[in-house]
Amino acid sequence: MSLLLSNSVLVGPKFRSSRISHASASLDIGLQRATSPQNASVPTCFEETKGRIAKLFHKNELSVSTYDTAWVAMVPSPTSSEEPCFPACLNWLLENQCHDGSWARPHHHHMLKKDVLSSTLACILALKKWGVGEEQINRGLHFVELNFASATEKGQITPMGFDIIFPAMLDNARGLSLNLQLEPTMLNDLIYKRDLELKRCNQSNSAEKEVYWAHIAEGMGKLHDWESVMKYQRKNGSLFNCPSTTAAAFTALRNSDCLNYLCLALEKFGSAVPAVYPLDIYSQLCTVGNLERLGISRYFLTEIQSVLDETYRSWLQGDEEIFMDASTCALAFRTLRMNGYNVTSDPITKILQECFSSSFRGNMTDNNTTLEIYRASELILYPEERDLVQHNLRLKTFLEQELSSNGFIQSCQLGRNINAEVNQAIEYPFYAIMDRMAKRKNIENYNIDNTRILKTSYRSPNFGNKDFLSLSVEDFNRCQVIHREELRELERWVIENRLDELKFARSKAAYCYFSAAATIFSPELSDARMSWAKNGVLTTVVDDFFDVGGSVEELKNLIQLVELWDVDVSTQCCSPNVQIIFSALKHTICEIADKGFKLQGRSITDHIISIWLDLLYSMMKETELGIDKSFPTMDEYMSNAYVSFALGPIVLPALYLVGPKLSEEMVNHSEYHTLFKLMSTCGRLLNDIRGYERELKDGKISAVSLYIMNNGGEITTEAAISEMRSWIERDRRELLRLVLEENKSVLPKACKKLFWHMCTVVHVFYSKDDGFTSLNLHGVVNAIINEPIVLNQF
């Protein structure tokens, strides 16, 4: 779709150009507003949608900026100040006025009237400067007069620098003898707002103020110190990769590098320019980010790897496109670090230091950037990143304050539920939300328009489009069908193995399966999911058996049966309960081992038995401590308690079923055991914090009570819990570091991810309640397994 064309007669040959070149036509694709979610339908062909998304990796479409194109059109020729340097831009303005007299984006948002006013006035100034397009000028002036009230309307989105740039353009209009009939009171309000903004800026001596003024230099008038602006010139000749600022700088100083930048932009895009250029790295990272956040990245692994490698090369080279833009830097850091690349957090720390050390905020950092920086600041892996810890806490407080004061109502992205996104980021940190939970929330909060706003609005299909949404919804629902069938299979398995006859045991098959489906959701990983879920059910049964259901004789009998393995259950089981539990254990271990043998090419039965024995021994030790009423040291307690937390049988056998080969050397390596210990320690401590009061009433020990006791009872419960949380934080960060690290790693990444997935599971289960007693979990389970996403519900 092209911009609406004027019916007026075009000017002479020297201003003519083809209506829209191929390059600018591709720009106009970005101007189209994507179909709204209410009207979108799931594609009839899954592969066609994937194909359209794959093409985004090979092009970076950016919407036309009429505002920036107007400023480029104002640039005089280097050889004659009486002629335009870029007549094609001028002709583009003549051809692309809307029927209402504005130069607006097609289907522009009703909250973008200030943007439309600014763009329209800039186009009028460009035409008037070169004495062409009288009819278009008059229609444009009429539009400005009719809509001038929007310039001071509080409900409208205010582009960056609007309160300074727009009044400056009005001054320029008067200087060019343009007769604008404006309502005096509204004009005075506008001037008052400009003076307030200038006063606010002048009260700050921060570097950010200087950057802000340089960025909006076209609105600062002839008194502006252009030489000071040029210190922000980038290697590509631009100022802030912004055509309008760069055009104004060339007009003032005739800087050849500025001109080269503008020429290159027009060479690429034809007769109209975008609001920001280049934006390749950010656009590609947005594509990757969309795919990862919506759960469909596995369909584009080759393309994503190429983007990551190229971004990492740019990072190592100190590319200005990354490091001169806070949003791109934060997005690059988070994406690279989460994908195992070795990147320092120093640039993020620097951005945060500049933000918090400045008293002048709110102009250069939009809501999207703030959220990106917050997400990046969560990825703390190393002890020496202490500054990042403090900055993350401060930024979290800032976001909470903005939420409570409705500070995000005016979002930098139209149609985006920024409040919901910020609330999710705060309430569910990345380590405390299971993968599928996060994906569903991201789908529900997704905005296909994704218009961004700086000095003017701009968008790109790489930022967001209906294909991302429709593919993710269809994929989520496809997986959900498989998950529902697997849950039915698990429920049949419970009955077939008579586990439902154990009256002492909690019935938690749905929750156990949910934790598997919410983390390892891909259809091809069915065996790993079922291993995880079945062992989850069995560990719950065994835990209840040791806790309330079995006598000491029965517990010892169960251990002995697993040790002997090849036994006659009809004669060697001391009770029906022991027979049911051991038979279910043996049947399940053999089933998993058979599947593992096919994938691994070697027997894994003995290892799975050993994993279960480790758990049984640790549970027996806890039972004996309870009988003896003895109190171990904290170290003694934790050396056993991380094993008795019972994550071993759930996670470790599943490692054999996710794809990669796991040799005997790998499972005996220290990395394997360290990952298990870190994951299990986090779970144990979270459990002990949540269950502290209950355990205390029952006369049982926990990490919290032992810590208080080991410190002579001289510290409070709150202090003990605070220490436990610090311990969890340290181990969680070390776990994530090991999972992401590739250079010195022995275990395949697909296997290491399961340790992290389980860490998120325990954070969810114990975030507010004691594990399975969480009232909110029922709704979450339904959302992941039972309730499909309906596209028209958004």
UniProtKB/Swiss-Prot annotation:
<feature type="binding site">
    <location>
        <position position="543"/>
    </location>
    <ligand>
        <name>Mg(2+) 1</name>
    </ligand>
</feature>
<dbReference type="Pfam" id="PF03936">
    <property type="entry name" value="Terpene_synth_C"/>
</dbReference>
<dbReference type="GO" id="GO:0009686">
    <property type="term" value="P:gibberellin biosynthetic process"/>
</dbReference>
<dbReference type="GO" id="GO:0000287">
    <property type="term" value="F:magnesium ion binding"/>
</dbReference>
<dbReference type="InterPro" id="IPR036965">
    <property type="entry name" value="Terpene_synth_N_sf"/>
</dbReference>
<keyword id="KW-0150">Chloroplast</keyword>
<dbReference type="GO" id="GO:0009507">
    <property type="term" value="C:chloroplast"/>
</dbReference>
<feature type="transit peptide" description="Chloroplast">
    <location>
        <begin position="1"/>
        <end position="28"/>
    </location>
</feature>
<keyword id="KW-0460">Magnesium</keyword>
<keyword id="KW-0479">Metal-binding</keyword>
<dbReference type="GO" id="GO:0009899">
    <property type="term" value="F:ent-kaurene synthase activity"/>
</dbReference>
<feature type="binding site">
    <location>
        <position position="695"/>
    </location>
    <ligand>
        <name>Mg(2+) 3</name>
    </ligand>
</feature>
<comment type="pathway">
    <text>Plant hormone biosynthesis; gibberellin biosynthesis.</text>
</comment>
<feature type="binding site">
    <location>
        <position position="687"/>
    </location>
    <ligand>
        <name>Mg(2+) 3</name>
    </ligand>
</feature>
<feature type="binding site">
    <location>
        <position position="547"/>
    </location>
    <ligand>
        <name>Mg(2+) 1</name>
    </ligand>
</feature>
<feature type="binding site">
    <location>
        <position position="547"/>
    </location>
    <ligand>
        <name>Mg(2+) 2</name>
    </ligand>
</feature>
<comment type="similarity">
    <text>Belongs to the terpene synthase family.</text>
</comment>
<dbReference type="GO" id="GO:0033332">
    <property type="term" value="P:ent-kaurene biosynthetic process"/>
</dbReference>
<comment type="pathway">
    <text>Secondary metabolite biosynthesis; terpenoid biosynthesis.</text>
</comment>
<dbReference type="InterPro" id="IPR008930">
    <property type="entry name" value="Terpenoid_cyclase/PrenylTrfase"/>
</dbReference>
<feature type="binding site">
    <location>
        <position position="543"/>
    </location>
    <ligand>
        <name>Mg(2+) 2</name>
    </ligand>
</feature>
<dbReference type="InterPro" id="IPR044814">
    <property type="entry name" value="Terpene_cyclase_plant_C1"/>
</dbReference>
<keyword id="KW-0809">Transit peptide</keyword>
<dbReference type="InterPro" id="IPR008949">
    <property type="entry name" value="Isoprenoid_synthase_dom_sf"/>
</dbReference>
<protein>
    <recommendedName>
        <fullName>Ent-kaurene synthase 1, chloroplastic</fullName>
        <ecNumber>4.2.3.19</ecNumber>
    </recommendedName>
</protein>
<dbReference type="InterPro" id="IPR001906">
    <property type="entry name" value="Terpene_synth_N"/>
</dbReference>
<dbReference type="Pfam" id="PF01397">
    <property type="entry name" value="Terpene_synth"/>
</dbReference>
<keyword id="KW-0934">Plastid</keyword>
<dbReference type="GO" id="GO:0016114">
    <property type="term" value="P:terpenoid biosynthetic process"/>
</dbReference>
<feature type="short sequence motif" description="DDXXD motif">
    <location>
        <begin position="543"/>
        <end position="547"/>
    </location>
</feature>
<dbReference type="InterPro" id="IPR005630">
    <property type="entry name" value="Terpene_synthase_metal-bd"/>
</dbReference>
<keyword id="KW-0456">Lyase</keyword>
<comment type="function">
    <text>Involved in the biosynthesis of ent-kaurene diterpenoids natural products such as oridonin, miltiradiene, eriocalyxin B and nezukol, known to exhibit antitumor, anti-inflammatory and antibacterial activities, and in the production of gibberellins phytohormones. Catalyzes the conversion of ent-copalyl diphosphate (ent-CPP) to ent-kaurene.</text>
</comment>
<dbReference type="InterPro" id="IPR050148">
    <property type="entry name" value="Terpene_synthase-like"/>
</dbReference>
